[in-house]
UniProtKB/Swiss-Prot annotation:
The lineage of its organism: Eukaryota, Cryptophyceae, Pyrenomonadales, Geminigeraceae, Guillardia. One of its GO terms (cellular component) is chloroplast. Pfam families: Ribosomal_L19 (PF01245). The gene is rpl19. The keyword Plastid applies. This is Large ribosomal subunit protein bL19c.
Amino acid sequence: MKSNKNLIQLVESNHSNKTLPQLQVGDTVRLGVSITEGNKERIQATEGVIISKSNCGINLTITIRRVLQGIGIERVYLLHSPKLKSIEILRKSKIRRAKLYYLRTRSGKATRLQQRFN
């Protein structure tokens, strides 16, 4: 079993060439995602609150939630994907849960999270 773990770590270390910021659940982030339209490539910025983190290592994913025109939009991003060009932390929040799925049932001011200043 140890040789399998070492082999997995070796493969993951070769493919995870990104240095990621310290992301936590509750942070408001802006992601730059590369989108190809025909033969053009552009970077689209998406912004939202991280409501969950899943997996580890090279398979690390985050779920981002944002409400646009009264409709909640959630998207899952693979953090070590080559399509993800930039990650910027806009705001850190003080939370006491590992998953913020309860934000799905709230609306308006109830979705605000208390800001952390450290």
